Design a protein with these regions (language model features):
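Conserved, single-site charged/polar hotspot
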Residues: 1-182
Length: 182
């Protein structure tokens, strides 16, 4: 059953032949239906465990997931790295990540060639910073401390990826900067 408190659950046990009330540890997570208190499931792997969610395992569509007011491609991992803070990481292919960086670092109205230069710089930066925040459970953060990344964007037409910024990413796919073999 579903109970609001441990006490309510224990009270319900009195009418059953056997049973134990089990709760989550300090590393447990409740996955709830967005905008409600309805628990879809609980997850607890203890310290060091993580929950991974991939919204479309078929690859048939361009599925996007909302998180903190923004839409993202790819999947997410959820884990408690330390204390009570939940670390949420968007896991996706590099080129999808670049599409979600270009427009937030520069804006989506810049000319195509400027956005292409930004795409190459952003790709170079993230590859040089792999595992930079490894102790926290991710490679790079999504703020201006690393690179501003907001995925597919919000509902604002003037803020987020555009056809031009997506084109800049695709036309420079795989290109990075090199200097003295590094």
């Amino acid at each position: 059953g579903s109970y609001a408190t441990k006490e309510t659950a224990e009270s319900a046990l009195t009418g059953l032949p056997q049973g134990t009330v089990v709760g989550t540890s300090a590393y447990g997570m409740n996955v709830v239906e967005t905008g409600t208190d309805h628990i879809l499931f609980q997850f607890d792997m203890g310290k060091g465990g993580a929950l991974g969610i991939l919204p479309d395992v078929t690859g048939a569509g361009d599925v996007r997931t909302w998180f903190s007011g923004y839409k993202y491609r790819g999947g997410f991992t959820y884990q408690r790295v330390s204390g009570n803070d939940l670390t949420v990481v968007n896991v996706l292919p590099l080129e999808d990540y670049i599409r979600g960086v270009i427009c937030y670092e520069m804006g989506n109205s810049w000319p195509l060639e400027a956005l292409k230069a930004q795409a190459i710089c952003a790709r170079t930066y993230v590859l040089r910073r792999l595992n930079y925040h490894g102790s926290l459970g991710f490679d790079v953060c999504n703020s201006d401390a690393c690179q501003v990344y907001r995925g597919v964007g919000s509902n604002r037409a003037d803020y987020g990826p555009s056809d031009t910024s997506d084109r800049a990413a695709s036309e420079t796919a795989g290109q990075v900067l090199w200097y003295n073999s590094t």
